[in-house]
């Protein structure tokens, strides 16, 4: 009995159970994940650099985009390097402190991104519905406040999760049925009574996920109502095009992340959860820079100018 209690309290290692696939498929998956990781980091660094080097992009919209890029870099870097290491070495072990750290940074960026996307929707609302007051409303002070709220909410939420999980006991199993330390999986693994914890996390996920989503819906409802009143078709197209990139990112991010966290326990499938996790930890962050560059003439123009300026022979 004494040895059992020691194992419960001193256990400081877990095993990440990634995809059960053949060695050949593991190599293919490794190459795919590595390419997506490099594209995500490189793409977001390019966007951040473009915004910094181009005075014409020093506007609230692009400041928000710069914050989003930084969050995406931290987001993927908290999960994918360890996953790549598992695919190469086959060593799926992760220490308890490393697991808590990974979960902290992942939750930090995920929640911050939810909040930031709602701020970006408000920015688009002001730009389209109240254009004459845009500069007055979206001033530097408000932008800093919105950035700070985004990062603070994410930090506070992830810190509470990290503290919560660090107090749990893990006596039954040390096998995490995912390729990273996911909050939902970690809680389910605990040998403690987790009924109230699961309810707390579920309610908090709804609040932190759906509240920004409702704010985004309200913003876009007002935007659509305003755009419909524009008489010229060219004006309507221009207004909608200024929102298309943000709307695409919202659909991708919310569609994949909430579909994983809002699934009832009766319909839960570990393999399906891993697949959805792969989508919102690797695929969606890779698409974000592409969406904001390929669909944005200002960014493409800035990129062209930078290339001409620095690649002159």
Q: Where in this protein do the model-derived segments appear?
A:
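Transmembrane helical core of 7TM receptor-like proteins
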Residues: 1-313
């Amino acid at each position: 009995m004494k040895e059992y209690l020691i194992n419960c309290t001193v256990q400081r290692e877990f095993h990440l159970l990634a995809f059960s696939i053949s060695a050949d498929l593991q190599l293919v998956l490794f190459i795919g994940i590595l390419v997506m990781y490099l594209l995500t980091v490189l793409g977001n660094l390019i966007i951040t650099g473009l915004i910094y080097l181009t005075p014409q992009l020093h506007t609230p919209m692009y400041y928000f985009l710069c914050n989003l890029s930084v969050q995406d870099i931290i987001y993927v870097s908290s999960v994918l390097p360890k996953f790549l290491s598992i695919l190469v070495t086959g060593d799926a072990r992760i220490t308890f402190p490393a697991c808590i750290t990974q979960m902290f940074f992942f939750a930090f960026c995920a929640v911050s991104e939810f909040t930031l996307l709602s701020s970006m929707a408000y920015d688009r609302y002001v730009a389209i519905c109240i254009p004459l007051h845009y500069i007055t409303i979206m001033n530097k002070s408000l932008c800093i406040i919105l950035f700070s709220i985004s990062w603070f909410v994410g930090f506070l939420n992830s810190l509470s999760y990290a503290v919560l999980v660090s107090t749990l006991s893990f006596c039954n199993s040390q096998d995490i049925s995912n390729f990273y330390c996911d909050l939902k999986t970690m809680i389910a693994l605990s040998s403690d009574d987790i009924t109230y914890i699961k309810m707390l996390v579920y309610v908090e996920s709804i609040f932190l996920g759906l509240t920004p989503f409702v704010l985004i819906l309200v913003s876009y409802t007002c935007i659509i109502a305003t755009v419909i009143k524009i008489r010229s078709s060219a004006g309507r197209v221009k207004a909608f095009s200024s929102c298309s990139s943000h709307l695409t990112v919202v659909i991708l991010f919310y569609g994949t992340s909430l579909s994983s966290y809002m699934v009832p326990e009766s319909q839960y499938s570990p393999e399906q959860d891993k697949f959805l996790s792969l989508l919102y930890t690797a695929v969606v962050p890779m698409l974000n820079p592409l969406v904001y560059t390929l669909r944005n003439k200002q960014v493409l123009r800035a990129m062209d100018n930078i290339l001409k300026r620095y690649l002159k022979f």
